UniProtKB/Swiss-Prot annotation:
This is Lactadherin. GO terms for cellular component: acrosomal membrane; collagen-containing extracellular matrix; endoplasmic reticulum lumen; external side of plasma membrane; extracellular exosome; extracellular region; extracellular space; extracellular vesicle. It is a peripheral membrane protein. It comes from Homo sapiens. Keywords: Amyloid, Angiogenesis, Cell adhesion, Cytoplasmic vesicle, Disulfide bond, EGF-like domain, Fertilization, Glycoprotein, Membrane, Phosphoprotein, Repeat, Secreted, Signal. Residues 1-23 form the signal peptide. InterPro entries: EGF-like_dom, FA58C, Galactose-bd-like_sf, Neuropilin_MCO_CoagFactor. The keyword Phosphoprotein applies. Plays an important role in the maintenance of intestinal epithelial homeostasis and the promotion of mucosal healing. Promotes VEGF-dependent neovascularization. Contributes to phagocytic removal of apoptotic cells in many tissues. Specific ligand for the alpha-v/beta-3 and alpha-v/beta-5 receptors. Also binds to phosphatidylserine-enriched cell surfaces in a receptor-independent manner. Zona pellucida-binding protein which may play a role in gamete interaction. Disulfide bonds join 27-38, 32-55, 57-66, 70-225, 212-216, 230-387. It comes from the Eukaryota. Medin has a ragged N-terminus with minor species starting at Pro-264 and Gly-273.
Length: 387
């Protein structure tokens, strides 16, 4: 029989049977990162790089080999998760029907007089749900209460369920295989973080209050990351992409003055100042903004944002994406279901972020945004995501 090192090389090239690879004691040189626990699985093939073992990750890590730190806020607080993605079993209505404590208010640190979700007092099994629109790793939840007429209201305990289709839900379990009850809050404002023992793969996440103080009032955030781990900012916001690599079809000049130009190099997410975005010089579907990434990269998504011009709100409401490796031959991103150019939903105001992830990542050096619809003028700030 070949020596173990040679056998390992052969197995990597030829996909050995599980029983053969187990003989190598693959877990002896732990292939799991970040403290992950390697466990052999006899007579099973997991289907990725190695058969016959699996990695159990520490809290806050995910991936086949626990290679990804996975505790990013998923978008409730910053608005990346839209109101339409948040639902609940019921809503409390107070103050003569004028105050509605609806689920879309349940965003961490939201301010205001009515700033959280509360279920109806008649709801015997309340829940609030987030639709992430795609499968993601979910690794934890941050909860917070709120107040009504100076009364502290919060969840003291809750359960978490998750689903891939929005119909069949599984609860997170404890070591005794029972539905795990997570510790909640102790006052109206303090935040409490619960990290799951293992990440869950989910598109839908539900919180079920089980014990509450005064009322089951909630603001919260989900923690996790993308399944493929390739959704990092590529350098627009942090300026690692130089100005000269951001170009456009045209640029608007307020009052026709060069001093008041809305240059393509300003199209950086969250850029501040009086002139803080790219604005096209004319209206029409022939306008575009182009980013040169410097080399071919895997691009998995985009975050867009509008801007304000002397009080006038302006943004791109929908757009297409084109990509190229030579800046001469362009391909428009296709909707995998229809086979036609995909139109992505854009923004609805001048400041919120709108994230769109590609179902099929693209490999390209040059990326163009092609506005389809807009409010007032074509105005854009953005970040590209990938690795």
């Amino acid at each position: 029989m070949p020596r173990p090192r040679l056998l390992a090389a052969l197995c990597g090239a030829l996909l050995c049977a599980p029983s053969l690879l187990v003989a190598l004691d693959i877990c002896s040189k732990n292939p799991c990162h970040n403290g992950g626990l390697c466990e052999e699985i006899s007579q099973e093939v997991r289907g990725d790089v190695f058969p016959s073992y699996t990695c159990t990750c520490l809290k806050g890590y995910a991936g086949n080999h626990c290679e990804t730190k996975c505790v990013e806020p998923l978008g409730l607080e910053n608005g990346n998760i839209a109101n339409s993605q948040i639902a609940a079993s019921s809503v409390r209505v107070t103050f003569l029907g004028l105050q509605h404590w609806v689920p879309e208010l349940a965003r961490l640190n939201r301010a205001g007089m009515v700033n959280a979700w509360t279920p109806s007092s008649n709801d015997d099994n309340p829940w609030i749900q987030v639709n992430l629109l795609r499968r993601m790793w979910v690794t934890g939840v941050v909860t917070q209460g709120a107040s009504r007429l100076a009364s502290h209201e919060y969840l003291k305990a809750f359960k978490v369920a998750y689903s891939l289709n929005g119909h069949e839900f599984d609860f997170i379990h404890d070591v005794n295989k029972k539905h795990k009850e997570f510790v909640g809050n102790w006052n109206k404002n303090a935040v409490h973080v619960n990290l799951f023992e293992t990440p869950v793969e989910a598109q839908y996440v539900r919180l079920y209050p089980t014990s509450c103080h005064t009322a089951c009032t909630l603001r919260f955030e989900l923690l996790g990351c993308e399944l493929n781990g390739c959704a990092n900012p590529l350098g627009l916001k942090n300026n690692s992409i130089p100005d000269k690599q951001i170009t456009a079809s045209s640029s608007y000049k307020t009052w026709g003055l060069h001093l008041f130009s809305w240059n393509p190099s300003y199209a950086r997410l969250d850029k501040q100042g009086n002139f803080n975005a790219w604005v096209a010089g004319s209206y029409g579907n022939d306008q575009w903004l182009q980013v040169d990434l410097g080399s071919s990269k895997e691009v998995t998504g985009i975050i867009t944002q509008g801007a304000r011009n002397f009080g006038s709100v302006q943004f791109v409401a929908s757009y297409k994406v084109a990509y190229s490796n030579d800046s001469a031959n362009w391909t428009e991103y296709q909707d995998p279901r229809t086979g036609s150019s995909k139109i992505f939903p854009g923004n609805w105001d001048n400041h919120s972020h709108k994230k769109n992830l590609f179902e099929t990542p693209i490999l390209a050096r040059y990326v163009r945004i092609l506005p389809v619809a807009w409010h007032n003028r074509i105005a854009l700030r953005l970040e590209l995501l990938g690795c």
